[in-house]
């Protein structure tokens, strides 16, 4: 657990705690707990000096009051840090790291917890060392004089020197400079240092080599980094979490609107003991910087407990598993029951659609209704902000308001740490745990999936947080699915999209990402928007009044869809004993009296999946009247696997000993069920899958698809193998799926013939041979991914043309196309574009939410086929599906409507309509025609805005990033560029063409 925040509170202006680690100071036979903090001081000339601050503490270091400064060790040129390990003792994988700190006057020995957090700490120390150059000025450390250390104990035992006892030996090369050690001497040490078990070399401090060398020598295959954190590793277990401590609302007597008397995480906020002039800690700059930061003024309610390793910078230092590590890890998973036991934790899960409102009432009737304080809070919101600014620019002050309201209303009988929060437009999820459990949370990740049109819009979709609690993996999902009673199939599709696209990176970057279903426990909450069907409004209200919930529940769309196993397969929902939570008149308990008069429905739901889960309550909270929804909560007892550390080490040692006895010289070999794969008639954005099975023989083996010489990936961009690597136990097998999917990135080369559906995959066995797999097939050219000028020269459908003609026209340059137009008679715009626009003009000019709702996935295939075959008369699709197909068509253009060459000019004159029109006139004729045609169509839509609810801002936001794309093809527009692009398009929507 990185307790740098507690250290930061003891520092003065100009000092910043980069990182901290909990350790044990070894003095002879005694062991004393110490908190080590790396502190940086910035001098007036922008130079930096560093020192190690050593603190004693009586309890977990959460605030500055919990620690007492014991000793300061400046990082001068004679500073060195090296690992020492007991000679002759059995090396235990995952054991603590023993390091020795050496200066000219001091020698101290510490034990630090095994894990990547300790590695990160050592690397930060390495970077902070002043270097080996004897001509470099030695730091003066005048700033340290303002600190007073505690008086040392009388007759404290002399620290053991690294060579004073025969029981220790060096395992680390020095971190830091030495007046008597040259660069060559350091390099020479690499050849003479012993290469015993667990040796790691970390070079740091060289002025000429700011990057350190990380090389690891493994013990019979190397250290094991288990799939899950080891209980008791309080520092390591928090390296992935984003904590902030909450007072949980203070005492029972404290009013909900009162101010908590705890430290603030707000930059200009103060805790009760801080003077009014106390400065805020400077923003972290190391690899522990938070990824999803809370806003700077989320104040007065939370206090920091530690900093998160939310980004992936630290992963660069994580060792990669070898074959032996994989075997050990596999055996540990198989024998998990030998060293774990089940312990129940109480989870509060809540969901609230707040309809864009600010918090107006205390949330305790919802969040603190139970007598016992929950161990974990999972709190989800939907429709946090309904403004267009939040919709298009993803920024909202409501985030801070609701975060503060939740923090004030947590159960008053406990203190809580905020682990993580994540937001996608109006969908927000907060995760808190009790302070005493914070040390056992790890591997925290947050991800979002938008299911709005083209996956761009975040008005609908899902957010999720995954984490490890002790030895159990948990995923919490908050989703807001498509609205309207008749749109249940779109809701089903939203659910499937969230499940397929929500992926969490693993600590080991070589491992494939985790999906929602790859967790032991899944909690799914949110406004799922499933309605009550086949009953009119009056009948629904009558059944509610009679409390005939079971009769009403039989008509619930979610129940019907789950029973049909189309969604939430394997999930469970508790019995519903409360009245529908939607739709009410805001500020009351009265059903909707608006013109639409929505029928009551259980839109807000909580489901779960996993073992050892008991639901204790499932209810709505009628006391809250801020929104047109009522909040819903569920309390669970969830059995979590907790590691018995002694049994874990015993199991680990048994596994290592058994592997040591395995002397198998056989080369691993496998048999493949299939080696040749043919994908016929591949179409744009239509997934094709082929599978084969790898059967292993008698030797454990690790397999991986490897890159061919001079290639950056193991396969072409349109192909993916799942999984692309893995481990097989003896006599086991695994099925590999080869997925072929052509998208905007690959379609143009396939249309032109520069690329073909042909590839060779190399399947490599660790310590074994390579197997070659042949992939072949044919691609059906499509208007998607074809240049504008190419399509203008195609008077016939693209699938009716010879492949040679399609290839030649696709490879033709824009300038050549313009020159040829004088001799030939091309169309002014692509016929495919006209087909889609004409369809929308005839059927959808008054369609509500056009270009804002996604279409149905199967209908895109139908639309694409109609365009590519020219059978426009057979086109019959949902208006939203055709609208999305139009956007996908524009997105797939290899050269956007406004050519890349004009991109920067367009941004520069985005406020000058006359200059903007002049730029359009300079475009190639086909591009100019398409632009004018689209603007005329969009202006026609705006004439019907009373019915379709479109306005210039919405259309400019949607089409701005499609018509104006950054020349750096894979670079997304930043916010400033995005606004300028929208402003450029906005001019043409409002002005005459």
Curated annotation (Swiss-Prot):
Q: How is it modified after translation?
A: Isoprenylation at Cys-990 may be required for localization at the membrane. May be proteolytically cleaved after Lys-320 as inferred from N-terminal protein sequence of the 75 kda form.
The domain-related comment in the record is:
The ASH (ASPM-SPD2-Hydin) and RhoGAP (Rho GTPase activating) domains form a single folding module. The ASH domain has an immunoglobulin-like fold, the Rho-GAP domain lacks the catalytic arginine and is catalytically inactive. The ASH-RhoGAP module regulates the majority of the protein-protein interactions currently described. The ASH domain mediates association with membrane-targeting Rab GTPases.
* Positions of modified residues (Cysteine methyl ester): 990
Q: MF terms per GO, please?
A: inositol-1,4,5-trisphosphate 5-phosphatase activity; inositol-polyphosphate 5-phosphatase activity; metal ion binding; phosphatidylinositol-4,5-bisphosphate 5-phosphatase activity
**How does the record describe its quaternary structure?**
Interacts with APPL1, PHETA1 and PHETA2. Interacts with several Rab GTPases, at least RAB1A, RAB2A, RAB5A, RAB6A, RAB8A, RAB9A and RAB33B; these interactions may play a dual role in targeting INPP5B to the specific membranes and stimulating its phosphatase activity. Interacts preferentially with non-phosphorylated RAB8A; phosphorylation of RAB8A on 'Thr-72' disrupts this interaction. Interacts with INPP5F.
Please state which protein family the record places this protein in.
Answer: Belongs to the inositol 1,4,5-trisphosphate 5-phosphatase type II family.
Tell me which species this is from: Mus musculus
Start and end of every PH domain? 22-148
Among CDD domains, the record links this protein to:
INPP5c_INPP5B (cd09093), PH_OCRL2 (cd13383), RhoGAP_OCRL1 (cd04380)
| Binding-site positions, substrate | 383, 459-460, 582-583, 596-598
Q: Does the keyword Transmembrane apply?
A: no
Quote the gene name from the UniProt entry. Inpp5b
Record-linked SUPFAM superfamilies: DNase I-like (SSF56219), GTPase activation domain, GAP (SSF48350)
* Annotated lipid attachment (S-farnesyl cysteine): 990
Q: Does the keyword Iron apply?
A: no
What protein does this entry describe? Type II inositol 1,4,5-trisphosphate 5-phosphatase
């Amino acid at each position: 657990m990185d307790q740098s925040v507690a250290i930061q509170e003891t520092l003065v202006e100009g000092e910043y705690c980069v990182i901290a680690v909990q350790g044990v100071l070894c003095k002879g036979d005694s062991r004393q707990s110490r908190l080590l903090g790396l502190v940086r001081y910035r001098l007036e000339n922008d130079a930096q000096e560093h020192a190690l601050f050593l603190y004693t503490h009586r309890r977990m270091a959460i605030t500055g009051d919990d620690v007492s400064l014991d000793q300061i060790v400046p990082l001068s040129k004679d500073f060195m840090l090296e690992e020492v390990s007991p000679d002759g003792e059995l090396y235990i994988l995952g054991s603590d790291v023993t390091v020795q700190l050496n200066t000219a006057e001091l020698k101290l020995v510490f034990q630090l917890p095994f894990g990547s957090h300790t590695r990160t700490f050592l690397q930060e120390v390495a970077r902070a060392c002043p270097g080996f150059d004897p001509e470099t000025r030695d730091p003066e450390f005048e700033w340290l004089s303002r600190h007073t250390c505690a008086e040392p104990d009388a007759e404290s035992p002399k620290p053991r020197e690294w060579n004073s006892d025969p029981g220790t030996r060096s395992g680390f090369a020095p971190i830091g400079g030495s007046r008597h050690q040259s660069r060559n001497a350091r390099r020479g040490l690499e050849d003479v240092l012993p290469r015993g078990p667990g040796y790691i070399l970390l070079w740091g401090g060289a002025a000429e080599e700011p990057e350190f060398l990380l090389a690891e020598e493994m013990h019979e295959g190397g250290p094991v980094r288990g799939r899950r954190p080891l209980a008791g590793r309080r520092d390591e277990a928090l390296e992935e979490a984003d904590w902030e401590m909450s007072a949980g609302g203070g005492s029972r007597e404290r009013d909900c609107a009162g101010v908590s008397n705890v430290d603030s995480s707000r930059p200009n906020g103060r805790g009760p003991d801080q003077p009014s002039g106390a400065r805020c800690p400077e923003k972290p700059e190391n690899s522990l910087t938070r990824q999803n930061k809370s806003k700077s003024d989320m104040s007065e309610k939370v206090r920091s407990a530690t900093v998160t390793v939310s980004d992936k910078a630290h992963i660069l230092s994580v060792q990669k598993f070898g074959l032996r590590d994989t075997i050990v890890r596999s055996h540990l998973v198989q024998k998990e029951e030998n060293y774990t036991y089940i312990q129940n934790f109480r989870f509060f899960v809540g969901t609230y659609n707040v309809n864009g409102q600010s918090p107006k009432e205390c949330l305790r009737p919802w969040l603190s209704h139970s007598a016992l304080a929950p161990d974990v809070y999972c709190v989800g919101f939907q429709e946090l902000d309904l403004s267009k600014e939040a919709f298009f620019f993803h920024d909202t002050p409501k985030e801070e308001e609701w975060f503060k309201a939740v923090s004030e209303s947590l159960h008053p009988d406990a203190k809580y740490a905020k682990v993580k929060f994540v937001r996608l437009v109006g969908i927000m999820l907060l995760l808190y745990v009790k302070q005493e459990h914070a040390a056992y949370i790890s591997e925290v990740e947050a991800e979002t999936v938008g299911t709005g049109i083209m996956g761009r819009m975040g008005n609908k979709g899902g957010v999720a947080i995954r984490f490890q609690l002790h030895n159990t993996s948990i995923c919490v999902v908050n989703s807001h699915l498509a609205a309207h009673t008749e749109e249940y199939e779109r809701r089903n599709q939203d659910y499937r999209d969230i499940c397929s696209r929500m992926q969490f990176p693993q600590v080991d970057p070589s491992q494939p990402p985790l999906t929602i279903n790859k967790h032991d426990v899944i909690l799914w909450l949110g406004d799922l928007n499933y309605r009550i069907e086949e009953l009119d409004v009056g009948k629904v209200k009558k059944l509610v009044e009679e409390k005939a919930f079971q009769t009403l529940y039989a008509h619930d769309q979610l129940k019907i869809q789950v029973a049909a196993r189309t969604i939430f397969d394997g999930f469970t929902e508790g019995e519903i004993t409360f009245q529908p939570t939607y739709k009410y008149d805001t500020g009351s308990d009265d059903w909707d009296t608006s013109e639409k008069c929505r029928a009551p429905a259980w839109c807000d739901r909580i489901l779960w999946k996993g073992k050892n889960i008991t639901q204790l309550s499932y209810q709505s909270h009628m006391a809250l009247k801020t929104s047109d929804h009522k909040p819903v909560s569920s309390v669970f007892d969830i059995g979590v696997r907790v590691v018995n550390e002694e049994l874990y080490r015993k199991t680990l040692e048994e596994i290592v000993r058994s592997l040591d006895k395995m002397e198998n010289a056989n080369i691993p070999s496998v048999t493949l069920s299939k080696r040749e794969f043919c994908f016929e008639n591949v179409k744009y954005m239509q997934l094709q899958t082929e599978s084969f099975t790898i059967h292993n023989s008698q030797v454990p083996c690790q397999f991986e698809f490897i890159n061919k010489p001079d290639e950056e990936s193991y396969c072409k961009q349109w192909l993916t193998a799942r999984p692309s690597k893995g481990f097989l136990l003896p006599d086991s097998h695994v099925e590999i799926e080869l997925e072929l999917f052509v998208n905007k990135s690959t379609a143009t080369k396939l249309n032109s013939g520069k690329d073909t559906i042909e590839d060779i995959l190399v399947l490599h066995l660790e310590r074994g041979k390579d197997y070659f797999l042949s992939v072949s097939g044919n691609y059906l050219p499509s208007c998607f991914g074809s240049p504008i000028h190419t399509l203008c020269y195609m008077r016939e459908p693209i699938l009716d043309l010879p492949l040679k003609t399609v290839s030649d026209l696709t490879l033709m340059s824009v300038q050549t196309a313009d020159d040829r137009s004088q001799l030939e008679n091309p169309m002014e715009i692509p016929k495919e574009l006209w087909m889609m626009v004409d369809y929308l003009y005839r059927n959808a000019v008054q369609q509500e939410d056009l270009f804002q709702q996604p279409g149905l996935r199967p209908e895109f295939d139908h639309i694409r086929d109609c365009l590519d075959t020219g059978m426009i008369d057979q086109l019959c699709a949902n208006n939203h599906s055709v609208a999305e197909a139009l956007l996908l068509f524009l997105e797939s253009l290899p050269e956007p409507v406004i050519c890349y060459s004009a991109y920067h000019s367009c941004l520069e004159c985005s406020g000058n309509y006359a200059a903007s029109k002049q730029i359009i006139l300079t475009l190639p004729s086909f591009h100019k025609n398409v632009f004018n045609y689209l603007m005329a169509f969009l202006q026609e839509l705006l004439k019907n805005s009373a019915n379709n609810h479109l306005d210039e801002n919405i259309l400019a936001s949607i089409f701005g990033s499609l018509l104006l794309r950054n020349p750096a093809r894979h670079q997304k527009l930043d916010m400033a560029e995005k606004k300028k692009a929208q402003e450029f398009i906005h001019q043409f929507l409002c002005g005459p063409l």
